[in-house]
Amino acid sequence: MDKKLLAMLACPVCKGELKLNDARTELICYQDAMAFPIREGIPVMLAVEARTLSTDERLDKH
């Protein structure tokens, strides 16, 4: 994902910062403990499509 695009995106729930996961398949909001999928290169920024981070993922902030 383009760094400029990532810098413009915000969590749709809290408007906080998003981080790209190591596999580059999800955008992570650590504040809300949510992971938004990236499908075919397009971020799916819908809370209903997000998954909740596991406890280990919450502790493994980058």
UniProtKB/Swiss-Prot annotation:
InterPro entries with a match to the protein in the record: Trm112-like
Q: Which domain of life is it from?
A: Bacteria
Q: Which residues cross the membrane?
A: none
Cellular component terms per the entry's GO annotation? cytosol
Gene3D superfamilies, per database record: 2.20.25.10
Q: Which family does it belong to?
A: Belongs to the UPF0434 family.
User: What is the name attached to this protein's record?
Assistant: UPF0434 protein Maqu_1739
